[in-house]
Regions:
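Residue-level detector of alpha-helix initiation sites
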Residues: 52, 112, 153-154
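Glycine/serine-rich phosphate-binding loop and adjoining beta1-alpha1 elements at the start
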Residues: 55-146
Length: 260
């Protein structure tokens, strides 16, 4: 549709290789392949990418550009300041809201994050990774382990699904009773507990859990620190905490990003 309006479309060389799209596929669709990200920025008004600009990319941006990407600025004030200084107009995927209040561009990423949080959590529960050495699912003569999911939005709901499929007992904590009731209608009551979230209930749940998933999200704002440093002291040595909210600053007081 962009090409149909006599616009030019540039794609960075090899940008689609990892997802199965060759340079030739873009060429056949009418795009022109450029060698570097700088070439893309230099020749374009509208920049479409996946993640927020790296620090070295800010120098390529100016007031002539409209940047369309996942920005997650609430968790990175320095990046926000740098973007403002460029004069660029930024449109954040994660804040694009449909008429019904849903977040259609954030939802797919959240579903993936929720699923992966259980995979990563189980990996770090292994003894070689200094974990408890437990499997989440119940096996013969061994009781199921507990997983607590704090925040039952899209990512949290996917984590719940994955936890139940693994055979774990899942504690679901959310500030909305309506949300908890909705989830109970979906998941029933077997191997799952629905808990209204507050400081005491969070502390109690995470003290029993082998794995804790933090998935609290407030649109366009820094995630509230619902799991404090003091609460972490009640967790079992070797238990694991995965903070999905880290791209919005994290919902755990001590969380910090360790990868990009």
């Amino acid at each position: 549709s962009v090409l149909a309006k006599n616009n030019k479309v540039y794609v960075e060389k090899d940008a689609g290789i990892a997802i199965g799209f060759s340079n030739q596929a873009y060429i056949e669709s009418g795009a022109e392949i450029l060698g570097t990200a700088f070439d893309i920025y230099d020749g374009s008004e509208l920049i479409v990418k996946v993640k927020e600009p790296l620090p070295e990319e800010n120098k390529f941006l100016s007031s002539k550009n409209i940047l369309f990407t996942y920005l997650h600025l609430a968790g990175n004030k320095e990046n926000a300041k740098n973007l403002i200084s460029t004069g660029v107009t930024g449109i954040a995927y994660e804040t694009v809201t449909a008429d019904d209040g849903s977040l259609p561009l954030l939802s797919p990423m959240s579903k993936i994050a929720g699923q992966i949080s259980l995979v990563v959590g189980q990996y770090f529960l292994l003894k070689p990774n200094k974990g408890l050495g437990t499997l989440l699912g119940a096996i013969e003569n061994v009781s199921a382990r507990e997983v607590s999911v704090v925040g039952a939005g899209v990512a949290g709901t996917e984590a719940i699904k994955k936890g139940l499929r693994s055979g774990a007992h899942v504690n679901v904590l959310d500030i909305s009773q309506n949300k908890l009731d909705e989830l109970q209608r979906s998941f029933g009551t077997e191997n799952i507990s629905y808990i209204l979230s507050n400081a005491d209930s969070i502390s109690n749940a995470i003290s029993r859990s082998d794995l804790v998933i933090g998935s609290v999200y407030v649109v366009g704002k820094e995630a509230p620190k619902v799991i404090t440093k003091e609460m972490l002291k009640v967790m079992k040595p070797g238990s694991v905490l995965v903070d999905i909210s880290i791209d919005q600053g994290g919902c755990v007081e001590t969380s910090k990003p360790t990868t990009h």
